[in-house]
Amino acid sequence: MSYYRKRLSPISPSQPIDYKDTELLRKFITERGKILPRRITGLTSKQQRDLTEAVKRARLMALLPFVNQEA
């Protein structure tokens, strides 16, 4: 019988996700600029919602590109 380890979130639950912290936000988007899904990031559902909102806000404020065409 195998046991599954509980996955820990890469961000502590007490750490706020801020739209101005672009270095943190870039860890959770692809090289094309798409937001990575929760099953890949390992975030909790609330953190994923906050991350999505922060990325979208950062895009509107021109801190992150909508589409990254470098690739």
UniProtKB/Swiss-Prot annotation:
Domain of life where this protein originates: Bacteria
Keyword terms: Ribonucleoprotein, Ribosomal protein, RNA-binding, rRNA-binding
GO BP field: translation
UniProt keyword Ribonucleoprotein present: yes
InterPro entries the record matches: Ribosomal_bS18 (IPR001648), Ribosomal_bS18_CS (IPR018275), Ribosomal_bS18_sf (IPR036870)
Keyword RNA-binding assigned: yes
GO cellular component terms attached to this protein's record: cytosolic small ribosomal subunit
GO function term, MF aspect, one: structural constituent of ribosome
Matching Pfam families: Ribosomal_S18 (PF01084)
Subunit field text: Part of the 30S ribosomal subunit. Forms a tight heterodimer with protein bS6.
Family listed: Belongs to the bacterial ribosomal protein bS18 family.
Functional note: Binds as a heterodimer with protein bS6 to the central domain of the 16S rRNA, where it helps stabilize the platform of the 30S subunit.
Descriptive protein name: Small ribosomal subunit protein bS18
Organism for this UniProt entry: Microcystis aeruginosa (strain NIES-843 / IAM M-2473)
